[in-house]
């Protein structure tokens, strides 16, 4: 059998369902209008009656992010968990509508994620700095495929208050951009996780006049640019107390913009460690030890 979306089809929210379901209903409404030309009205009512209706309801009995999607010749019912379950049911229905249009095959789907964390890591540093509009499009696409975590990697591409030398020739993301993106992602069931370079390949930062002296390798700031050099060098000099203060400062400013309980320190690729200013310390303690000590201080 089939279910046909009519010009008089409506989307009903259970009167007991949380207000967040309205956003999922709007997402479905926009998809139906785009694919079929019909724009179903969204209603909220206890025990709606009629045919060719789409019901969205939340159930605390379903496991986290789980949902059921039932398509019958009369109606469509999506029942999901309180945490993104209804949203994921809507995303599946959107995918069906893109394939079948207004005439959908009858089906019963019971679905839940096999992996709790399904993340996408986005580099917002190398190449052009993405705009807020682009990042929202990316988040919408990720949610469509039920990705629930987006890590935004930053080096120089955020407008740190007192680091104008670092970003002045770029178009960095602002605090307002991040706050808006965080809010937008949350509405799509995505945890926006901050990811900030804090130890290695700090090319733009350690090439400034104010902070070049904190680079592990002397003279790195004046070396000709190359993509390899940008990645392989420009590690903080851990023997200088200013390095730890600087790293903590940028981490503190950036992490406060996010509602996520996670933070990615990105203290990787410190290829220069122990080869310049910290050579003597590395020979005394070992590179692994001095690396671990610095990262522990950061955390």
Pin down the residues of each PLM region.
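Contiguous, structured surface segment used for ligand recognition
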Residues: 1-118
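Substrate-binding cleft of carbohydrate-active enzyme catalytic domains
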Residues: 115-299
């Amino acid at each position: 059998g089939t279910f046909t979306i009519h010009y008089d089809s409506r989307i009903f929210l259970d009167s007991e369902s949380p207000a967040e379901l309205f956003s999922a209903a709007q997402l479905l409404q926009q998809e139906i209008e785009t694919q079929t030309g019909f724009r179903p009205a969204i209603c909220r009512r206890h025990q709606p009656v009629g045919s060719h209706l789409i019901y969205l309801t939340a159930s605390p009995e379903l496991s986290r992010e789980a949902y059921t999607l039932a398509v019958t010749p009369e109606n469509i019912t999506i029942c999901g968990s309180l945490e993104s379950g209804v949203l994921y049911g809507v995303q599946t229905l959107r995918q069906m509508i893109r394939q079948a249009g207004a005439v959908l095959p009858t089906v019963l789907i019971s679905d839940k994620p096999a992996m709790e964390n399904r993340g996408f890591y986005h580099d917002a540093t190398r190449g052009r700095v993405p705009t807020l509009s682009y990042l929202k499009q990316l988040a919408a696409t990720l949610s469509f495929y039920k990705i629930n975590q987006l890590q935004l990697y930053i080096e120089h591409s955020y407008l740190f208050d007192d680091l104008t030398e670092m970003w002045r020739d770029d178009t960095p993301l602002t605090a307002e951009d991040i706050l808006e993106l965080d809010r937008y992602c949350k509405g799509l069931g995505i945890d926006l996780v901050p990811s900030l370079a804090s130890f290695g390949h700090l090319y733009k930062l350690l090439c400034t006049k104010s902070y070049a002296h904190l680079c592990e390798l002397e003279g790195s700031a004046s070396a000709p640019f190359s993509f390899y050099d940008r990645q392989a060098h420009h590690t903080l000099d851990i023997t200088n107390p200013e390095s730890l203060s600087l790293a903590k400062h940028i981490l503190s400013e950036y992490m406060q913009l996010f509602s996520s309980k996670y933070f990615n320190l990105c203290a990787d690729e410190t290829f220069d460690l122990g080869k310049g200013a910290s050579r003597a310390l590395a020979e005394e303690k070992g590179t692994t030890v001095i690396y671990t000590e610095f990262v522990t201080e950061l955390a």
